[in-house]
């Protein structure tokens, strides 16, 4: 059965199928090769991927492959210097991956409202929530629509705190 032939509701008792992953034949073959090798995590293929990614964005940058978006955000929070007891502002409208690492790290979350036009974090709401205790602003570019980055950057610069983009 091809991707286009896959029914949206294969079994009415299970509801609407929201996600059906498409994996190309090339990717499937690469995955089979990876799983039949002795390196499941870090190894030659990951090193090759990191090198290619790094070269795409300039040799001065480094690239670290992670197992998931949640892992990537957790690493970003650590690299931003966030620690237990710190306070961050983030959007109320996001995937759990944004907040689970914060909870795991013992960081206090203040939820900002969203703009009704874009569903992105509201700059005005962030302004009301920001304080001397705020250690970062975490924004999510929902549905491919960019947040008001110039406004967020100005606010972050004023309070000397980082912006972490999801």
What are these regions (language model features)?
Residues 23, 41, 94, 117-118, ...:
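Glycine-/small-residue-rich active-site loops that bind phosphorylated ligands and cofactors
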Residues 30-31, 53, 72, 88, ...:
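Generic structural signal for small/hydrophobic residues in well-ordered secondary structure
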Residues 117-165:
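Active-site phosphate-binding strand-loop segment of PLP-dependent enzymes
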